[in-house]
């Protein structure tokens, strides 16, 4: 019967990578000691009954010597107040004052493929309000590569320094991810691929030869 079992699919071994997401409540792993970049969840921006709310995800500001740090905001509304913008600038300054090498801000927002124009406008406004030494990055959905409007994707690219396309939901790789990745030739902007630790993953042969591909980020 053993010969009838389906072949096991290769999975993501975090030790083979150097860039990671670290969410609140997730215990740091040894792979972080050799990390080049760490994307740290700092806060959520929620749509509260009286306007947007900054929901802090970390009680203290750690000091991490070595890797580049991207602060991540998990965003549920694109309507921000001046108070939210002030809080963002204050947190960027606090992390830097603690001795961290903060290089950028990443927005984690589930922008629907059919509404990327509104997201592009938001990112353009946000870009203008960030300190000049702070990069702007975003996460993206796999569907963008297959069905995203090229002009809207170009507008987004004009405001951000990097896009990380996530091939997972929760703790599982998205079924059929290979079909979406086959459409990456439509992407004319620099991108990374976001993987989940332990999730199924087999690198497409064409990916590394794609001139826009910039590497991986692994969700721990």
Residue ranges and their predicted role:
Residues 3-220:
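Secreted glycan hydrolases and related glycan-binding modules that recognize and/or cleave
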């Amino acid at each position: 019967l053993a010969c009838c079992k389906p072949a096991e699919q290769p999975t993501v071994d975090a030790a083979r990578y150097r860039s990671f997401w670290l969410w609140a409540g997730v215990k740091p792993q040894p792979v972080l000691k050799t990390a080049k970049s760490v994307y740290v969840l700092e806060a959520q921006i929620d749509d509260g009954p009286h306007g947007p709310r900054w929901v802090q995800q970390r009680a203290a500001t750690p000091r991490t010597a070595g890797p580049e740090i991207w602060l991540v905001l998990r965003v549920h509304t694109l309507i921000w107040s001046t108070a939210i913008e002030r809080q963002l600038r204050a947190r960027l300054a606090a992390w830097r004052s603690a001795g961290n090498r903060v290089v950028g801000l990443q927005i984690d927002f589930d922008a629907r493929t059919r509404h990327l124009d509104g997201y592009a406008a938001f990112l353009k406004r946000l870009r203008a309000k960030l300190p000049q030494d702070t990069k702007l990055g975003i996460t993206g959905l796999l569907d963008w590569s297959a069905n995203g409007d090229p002009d809207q994707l170009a507008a987004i690219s004009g405001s951000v320094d990097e896009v990380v396309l996530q091939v997972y939901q929760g703790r599982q790789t998205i079924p059929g991810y290979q079909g979406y990745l086959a459409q990456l030739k439509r992407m004319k902007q620099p991108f990374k691929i976001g993987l989940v630790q332990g999730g199924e993953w087999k690198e497409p042969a064409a990916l590394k030869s794609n001139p826009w591909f910039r590497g991986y980020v692994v969700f721990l």
